Amino acid sequence: MVAKIKSGDLVKVIRGKDRGKEGTVKRVLKDDRLIVEGVQIVKKHVRATQQGQQAGIVSVEAPIHRSNVMVIDPETKQPTRVGVVIKEEARDGKVKTVRVRVAKKSGKELA
């Protein structure tokens, strides 16, 4: 199965307190959550460690569920759904079927 959202994708938040913000996906977690750059910022209290790190309040990005974001179409710059197209490619003298992610609005392949 091909993942609909991968790290490095440009996404837009469609629900929640950060609605309308755009960011790049840093990590995709196993429980259908994403860490998006600049979105879902929370304050975290950090203890001092023995290595000299200071105690204090740090801003970090919290995970957001994948149903609350949409991938931005590279051609139209609008949020779009993601589809999967099966293509046949010749690699090393053999024909292999490959699943490719495609933006539904423009039909353009996603990287």
Curated annotation (Swiss-Prot):
Protein name in UniProt: Large ribosomal subunit protein uL24
Claim: NAD is one of the keywords in the record: no
Membership in a protein family: Belongs to the universal ribosomal protein uL24 family.
Native source species: Bifidobacterium animalis subsp. lactis (strain AD011)
UniProt key word Hydrolase: no
GO terms under biological process: translation
Any one annotated GO CC term: ribonucleoprotein complex
Superkingdom of origin organism: Bacteria
